Amino acid sequence: MTPQQRAGHFALPSKPDRNPPPAEEARRIEDKQGPLRVLVVEDDFLIAMQTEVALTAAGFEVVGPAMTAEEAVALAGEAQPTLAVMDIRLASTRDGIDAARQLYQDFAIRCIFATAHDDAHTRGRAEPYAPLGWLPKPYTMASLVAVVAEAVAELRRRP
C-alpha cells in the first residue's frame, strides 16, 4: 500500500487492556485539588486529537495540544496543568525532554513521556525531571488513560 492509499485513514486501536477511570472519579479528585488539567504535547496531529478525545472522555481537562516545545512552555505558563503527556521527538529544534526540563524547573510540572524512542540514553536524559511514567508508542487509548490516572494518583500521594 502506498502512502497515498493510506492517506485519509487513521486508527489507534484501543483494546480493553485496562478500563479508563470513570469520569466521576476524575471529578472527585478535581473537587479536592482543583481541575485536573493534562497538557498534551504531540506533533502528530491525529495522535494529539485521539489523545485529547480519550482524556476528555475519561474526565480530564485537556490543555493543548502543543506541537512544539515552545508552545508547550507557553501553554503551561497560561493554564498551569497538573501534568503533561510529552512526546519526545517534536516538530521544533527543542525536543520533548528539553521542554520537560523547562516545565519542571519553571512550573514544577512533571511529565509522562509518550515515545517510540524508549532507550536507556533517552531515559537517562529525562530522569532529572522526575518522569511520572513512560508510555511506549504505539499505545492504546485505554493504556494512555490508565497511565495518566496512575500519575494523578502518584501526585496525590506526593504533592
Explain the meaning of each model-derived region:
Residues 126-135:
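As written
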Residues 49-57:
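Charged docking surfaces used in two-component/phosphorelay signaling
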Residues 52, 65-83, 91:
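Acidic, metal-coordinating helix/loop segments flanking the phosphotransfer/catalytic sites
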Residues 87-101:
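Conserved phosphotransfer microenvironments
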